[in-house]
């Protein structure tokens, strides 16, 4: 949260140069506080796990949050109890008249398909368009990032020769960006995907900015519309054992997967994972909630446009 200090204090300018968030008294006195309304469009197969992963991160701030879990209609979800979906989820039609301060669209296990062949693609296109007029800031994760970039900007995804799985070293390209306040020079992020977007394609679109990348796993975070759209190709939200579960799942299916890169201690699955991304995952989501949601959203949620 910001430090509230007098605007004439000499430290103000120095703190701003260091990318420390300060809020001057005049602005602080005019701020109203209400619970933030966040919606999650959960397209992952193991919905309970994804709910827990995301809630672990978005609850780690002083901000009060009201959450709606959302699904597209017309798709049969086979890996989550129907009773759970009926009790805790809403359809897009249930919420499309609402405005939200923040919106998270998760990944989905459909990377090998063309976007147009995904059965809920037409509705997802409607949701992407809706988010531009009903949400202050939207995070798109993994497949959702590829889908959003394709829908809004025509950027095509490219299927990888083999699955990218592991925990990779990343760097910030835009150090003054509030999304990275408190980040180390090098930080780690899990990736688990079969497709990618390419840097050269993104650089052709003036409205897009690559703000973080990895020498091994490629483009990580792309931003548009001053942070109203954030595209994240990795899985910072993953729990310590998620990549391990995916690896053993693929083994049991006879898929002969590679051991996730830089994930296990000494690259040995028997020794378990070395968790190196937890603190930066928390920073990423708390910075998003503070600087791109709380600080930008209108007090009257009906004023979001």
Question: For each of these PLM feature ranges, what is it?
Answer:
Residues 1-74, 89, 95, 99, ...:
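Amide-donor transfer/coupling interface in amidating biosynthetic enzymes
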Residues 73-86:
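N-terminal beta-loop-helix "entrance" segment that forms/cooperates
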Residues 105-174:
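Cysteine-nucleophile active-site neighborhood
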Residues 53-55, 83-84, 117-120, 153-156, ...:
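Short, glycine/charged-enriched secondary-structure capping and boundary segments
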């Amino acid at each position: 949260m910001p430090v509230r200090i007098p605007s004439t204090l000499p430290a103000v300018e120095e703190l701003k140069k260091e990318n420390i968030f300060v809020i001057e008294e005049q602005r602080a006195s005019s701020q109203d506080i209400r619970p933030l309304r966040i919606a999650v469009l959960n397209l992952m197969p193991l919905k309970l796990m994804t709910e827990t992963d995301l809630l672990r991160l978005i609850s780690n701030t002083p901000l009060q949050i009201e959450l709606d879990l959302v699904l597209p209609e017309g798709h049969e979800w086979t890996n989550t109890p129907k009773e759970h979906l009926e009790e805790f989820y809403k359809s897009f039609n249930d919420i499309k008249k609402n405005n939200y301060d923040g919106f998270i669209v998760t990944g989905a296990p459909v990377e090998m398909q063309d976007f147009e062949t995904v059965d809920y693609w037409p509705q997802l296109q409607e949701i992407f368009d809706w988010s531009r007029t009903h949400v202050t800031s939207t995070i798109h994760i993994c497949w959702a990032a590829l889908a959003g970039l394709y829908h809004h900007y025509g950027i095509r995804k490219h299927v990888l020769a083999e699955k990218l799985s592991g925990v990779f070293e990343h760097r910030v390209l835009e150090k003054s960006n509030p999304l990275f306040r408190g980040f180390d020079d090098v930080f780690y992020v899990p990736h688990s995907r079969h497709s990618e977007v390419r840097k050269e394609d993104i650089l052709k679109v003036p409205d897009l900015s690559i703000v973080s990348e990895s020498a091994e796993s490629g483009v990580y975070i792309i931003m548009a519309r001053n942070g109203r759209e954030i595209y994240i190709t990795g899985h910072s939200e993953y729990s310590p054992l998620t990549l391990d579960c995916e690896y053993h799942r693929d083994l049991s299916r006879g898929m002969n997967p590679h051991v996730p890169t830089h994930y296990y201690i000494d690259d040995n699955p028997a020794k378990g994972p070395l968790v190196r991304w937890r603190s930066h995952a928390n920073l990423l989501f708390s910075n998003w909630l503070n600087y791109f949601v709380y600080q930008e959203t209108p007090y009257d949620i009906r004023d979001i446009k």
